[in-house]
Amino acid sequence: MAATLRELRGRIRSVGSIKKITKAQELIATSRIARAQVRLESARPYAVDITRMLTTLAYEAVLDHPLLVASATPKRAGVLVVSSDRGLCGAYNANVFRRSEELFSLLRAEGKTPILYVVGRKALNYYTFRNWGIAESWTGFSEQPKYENAAKIASTLVDVFMLGSSESDAGVDELHIVFTEFKSMLSQSTKARRMAPMVVEYVEESKLPRTLYSFEPDATTLFEALLPRYLTIRVYAAMLESAASELASRQRAMKSATDNADDLIKALTLEANRERQAQITQEISEIVGGANALANAR
């Protein structure tokens, strides 16, 4: 009985230590999520506007650019998978990998070979363990991505896209990105989006007056100047979405773990008290029994 009581007290101490860790992780995630949301909300308008600008530019100038014209026979598709560097964030990474596998299956069904690019140690470890060939990886900034990180990634993607699969074995015909879209603290969803070639929506002619644009120095030069910025901001916005989603998932997961630790400590404490009560009762019974035996001996 004494051994059982010691075991229960040891388990209570162990759970208490784990609770301190999960509570600390919860507080850290909570403190960082506000800054992540501010950065995300600041970047979203720019991402929307530059996409609208390029779409308008392509529509008005009728450009013939690789970013706009899909390859007649696409062979390879580059896929950028955005994951986290650390765990303890619930099903965040599992959902990203599941959505990535769905995209890979879809690309293969279309006769395209996926070329993998990853952000985050979790994706790097996941695909390395499964013997996937990883073309390029970037780690160490999943929680707090910077524009410079996105620019470096986008530069690599632009280079392989402009090469094309017909010109080089290192080139790709399409660029896709898998990331987690942040909607609220309680809602995030994994998305797979095509970044290149761009999808340009050509609207029907309207009877209403429309804005006329003048492009200087010319539409092609302007488009090529904006192209790196477009892909950079698309990657940066996706990384900010994923960072906010990662922190929200970690905050929820750690809060749930802390609450479960509280419940387990209460249950173990109750069981330990019962064991202690039984031990005291047994000791009292032994004392009373001994006293009665001495009284009868007299």
From Swiss-Prot:
It comes from the Bacteria. It is a peripheral membrane protein. GO terms for cellular component: plasma membrane; proton-transporting ATP synthase complex. GO terms for molecular function: ATP binding; proton-transporting ATP synthase activity, rotational mechanism. Its main location: membrane. It is found in: Cell membrane. Keywords: ATP synthesis, Cell membrane, CF(1), Hydrogen ion transport, Ion transport, Membrane, Transport. One of its GO terms (biological process) is proton motive force-driven plasma membrane ATP synthesis. PANTHER family: ATP SYNTHASE GAMMA CHAIN, ATP SYNTHASE SUBUNIT GAMMA, MITOCHONDRIAL. Produces ATP from ADP in the presence of a proton gradient across the membrane. The gamma chain is believed to be important in regulating ATPase activity and the flow of protons through the CF(0) complex. Belongs to the ATPase gamma chain family. NCBIfam families: ATPsyn_F1gamma, PRK05621.1-2. HAMAP family: ATP_synth_gamma_bact. F-type ATPases have 2 components, CF(1) - the catalytic core - and CF(0) - the membrane proton channel. CF(1) has five subunits: alpha(3), beta(3), gamma(1), delta(1), epsilon(1). CF(0) has three main subunits: a, b and c. This is ATP synthase gamma chain. The lineage of its organism: Bacteria, Bacillati, Actinomycetota, Actinomycetes, Mycobacteriales.
